[in-house]
Amino acid sequence: MDGVANKPDCMVSVRERFGFDSDLMVPAFSARDDHVPDIDDAYRFNPDVTLAILAGFARNRRVLVQGMHGTGKSTHIEQVAARLNWPCVRVNLDGHISRLDLVGKDAIVVRDDVQVTEFQEGIVPWALQRPVALIFDEYDAGRPDVMFVIQRILERDGKFTLLDQNRVIHPHPSFRLFATANTVGLGNLNGLYHGTQMLNHAQMDRWNVVATLDYLPRDEEIGIVCARVPELADEAGRPLLESMVSLAELTRNGFATGDLSTLMSPRTVINWAENCQIFRDPALAFRLTFLNKCDDAERPVVAEYYQRCFGEELAVASRAGGGEPGAGR
């Protein structure tokens, strides 16, 4: 990160850089380094969520992006950072991330052929002292002791105290903090996200901006799949893509009405399209990509959705049936 300026050294237009009807100017870096994400030209930005994230970069707001799985929450933040050349680090708050991982710990190192105990900083003090956007993924799955470490830095000018070092770290002026979550801190209400926690409301209240990222409009979702799987972008592949996205929309509506306990995300549709190129059979690819993840009792409903969109029956086998129907074709 030595090659990156200590602070943003240029201003960019949101209208020119992101194509939105906005007069907002945001700070950016003119040079890139290894921590800047790669630009994905196929990514589609949600205007409201993008403006919320840009407010985080421009005005040092703490931004939490909430949405269902596969909507591209973390990627959304990364792609904004990529276009600002802002260094970015993601930390997944799984059950194995501990307070010591975030804060730091004493470690035995060799200095001049002698073993000595030395304090090694965790990711939080490391990022706080640098022009870095720190992203906490799966924020609502973090353990309580970990969450209270994060609470210290949620204040915009929040200083971080290293008790083991008797040292107070002042945030770098270009440090930014973001997080992504499937829930809004209320726990696993719909049964989809096991392992999520009910979050302390005092901590949720410290987030300056909470943005909700929903699934893309139909045409934009088709455009993303075309960009990811260009083999289906021609006139012959377009009807197939439209049927695939129509089926995904039916599963989402079925989930909303309680007919299904799972749904197809844009990520699932992309996986299905990629698997179609492998198996050369949309029905088989669909079974292997999504249907086999569904409960046995719900598979006839999904098969009906498939019949509506593709005009042909989908062979459905129970888990006890053994094997994939049509796998030998």
Task: Say what each PLM segment does.
Residues M1-A236:
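AAA+ P-loop NTPase catalytic core and its hallmark functional loops
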Residues M1-V36, Y43, T50, P217-I222, ...:
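Alpha-helical lid/collar subdomain of P-loop NTPases
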